[in-house]
Amino acid sequence: MALGGLYKRYQIGEQQLTTTSVITCPPNRKLDGIHEKSTPLMLDWQDQDLINMWLDPSLTDSEAFRHLLTGELMTSITATPIKGARDLSARGETLEIVKD
């Protein structure tokens, strides 16, 4: 899985900064209990045409991606609940969440 995001580089004096953000979509009911507020834009990394289009810096028309901004799961995911950000050990069974 790849996440759809944006980045921008800034030059401030001698320092170059890069900022990033992950694009979010409306929540998906299949992710209730995991992430209820929004769904990150998930791109199917095996769809090489989509990935190439996403990474093409000459493509500036965001309408080409409107169909992806629905919150629909475009790819199946596997999720394992963990104890916390500092303890990545599993605290439950792994779930298979099938794409829409």
Language-model-derived ranges and their functions:
Residues 1-100:
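Short linear sequence motif anchored by a di-proline
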